[in-house]
């Protein structure tokens, strides 16, 4: 299965609780943390919600 390399580039400070929870759900809780996530529709939806806070690479 394909994976996505996701890096947090934005701070969750002054963001809505939903956006903070989404970052935690993705395994990102600190700036410049990188995770390899499976490319699923669920993960894509979460990334769309916090697109302004993360950088996605294939």
UniProtKB/Swiss-Prot annotation:
Protein name per the record: Large ribosomal subunit protein uL30
Protein family according to the UniProt entry: Belongs to the universal ribosomal protein uL30 family.
Keyword list, A-Z: Ribonucleoprotein, Ribosomal protein
Gene Ontology annotations for the cellular component aspect, listed alphabetically: cytosolic large ribosomal subunit
Classification lineage: Bacteria, Pseudomonadati, Pseudomonadota, Alphaproteobacteria, Sphingomonadales
HAMAP family recorded: Ribosomal_uL30_B
GO molecular function, one term: structural constituent of ribosome
Designated gene of the protein: rpmD
Highest taxon in the source lineage: Bacteria
One of the GO biological process terms: translation
InterPro entries (alphabetical): Ribo_uL30_ferredoxin-like_sf, Ribosomal_uL30_bac-type, Ribosomal_uL30_ferredoxin-like
Pfam families associated with the record: Ribosomal_L30 (PF00327)
């Amino acid at each position: 299965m394909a994976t996505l390399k996701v890096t947090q580039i934005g701070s969750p400070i002054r963001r809505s609780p939903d956006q903070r929870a989404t970052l935690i759900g993705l395994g990102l809780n600190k700036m410049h943390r990188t995770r390899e996530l499976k490319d699923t529709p669920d993960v894509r939806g979460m990334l769309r919600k916090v697109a302004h806070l993360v950088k996605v690479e294939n």
